């Protein structure tokens, strides 16, 4: 990894001699480097120099604040902890797969893990903060392309992005969108993880930098219980009682407490309190408490 960064920094230094950021990128692209790689090189170089600042005093910013700031970012890692999302949240993700293909490397493939699964749905996807209008509703393991009404990512009578969402079941199959590449095999299933796979066609008017992808999702399906302490089918919920119960009992990302050791009637009572309707401003009726949280699993 160090060699890649060193090379990127070196190329960036050479490019910056042409003064502006835009000209620097054009310099890299004109040097015979494929556009996606040029963007990556420029991003790494810029990050390297922009972060080389004098050390400042530590005023005690909490880990929580740092985690909150990173929720909408795109990270690049193969060992980063995966968050749990309860309720409805807009999140970034972790790029676990990036590769180019095509005669001139004009296609960029990305596998972006959002959170632990299984989730209810991916409702919206944004590229560089622009909402993408798709050819149909986003659904699990369903291919979508950009609709012709989208002015940002539909160019020259063609979609620039193809996407497949994967909601993170434990029986999740290989993504055939990424599976067109030999490096994404039938063993790459990302079971139990909610992720989106994308294929992007290079267009200098649509992509001014390495794209940042975010998604509005309905998060983790959780198990609720009825008044007789009978478990219900796992479903999306923003009720804090059932979200807490899921975290306490989950063995993969939570505390792994056996359900037999949990006072289920107390959670049922608490869930009813949370679902109590109250009148907000404008006479709108809302629950007294909802949970729309992103949980940092590295602090388990």
Task: Show where each model-derived region lies.
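Polar, S/T/G-rich
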Residues: 2-15, 29-300
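Hydrophobic alpha-helical membrane-interaction elements
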Residues: 24-27
């Amino acid at each position: 990894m160090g060699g890649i960064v060193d090379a990127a920094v070196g190329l960036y230094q050479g490019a910056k001699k042409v003064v502006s950021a835009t000209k620097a990128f054009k310099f890299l692209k004109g040097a015979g480097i494929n556009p996606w790689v040029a963007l990556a090189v420029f991003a790494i170089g810029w990050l390297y120099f922009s972060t080389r600042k004098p050390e400042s005093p530590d005023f005690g910013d909490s880990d929580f604040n740092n985690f909150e700031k990173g929720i909408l970012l795109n990270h690049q890692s193969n060992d980063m902890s995966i968050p749990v999302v309860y309720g409805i949240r807009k999140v970034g993700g972790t790029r676990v797969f990036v590769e180019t293909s095509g005669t001139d490397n004009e296609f960029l493939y990305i596998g972006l893990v959002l959170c632990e699964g299984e989730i209810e749905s991916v409702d919206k996807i944004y590229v560089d903060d622009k909402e993408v209008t798709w050819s149909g509703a986003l659904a699990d393991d369903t291919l979508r392309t950009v609709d012709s009404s989208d002015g940002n990512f539909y160019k020259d009578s063609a979609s620039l992005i193809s996407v497949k969402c994967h909601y993170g079941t434990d029986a999740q199959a290989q993504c055939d969108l990424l599976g067109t590449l030999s490096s994404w095999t039938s063993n790459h299933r990302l079971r139990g993880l909610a992720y989106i796979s994308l294929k992007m066609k290079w267009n200098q008017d649509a992509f001014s930098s390495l794209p940042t992808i975010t998604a509005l999702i309905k998060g983790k399906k959780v198990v609720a219980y009825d008044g007789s302490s009978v478990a219900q089918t796992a479903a999306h919920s923003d009720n804090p009682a059932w979200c807490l119960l899921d975290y306490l009992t989950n063995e993969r990302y939570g505390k792994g407490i056996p359900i037999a050791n949990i006072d289920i009637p107390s959670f049922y009572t608490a869930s009813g309190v949370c679902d109590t309707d109250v009148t907000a401003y404008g006479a709108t009726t809302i629950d007294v408490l909802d949970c729309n949280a992103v949980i940092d699993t590295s602090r388990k």
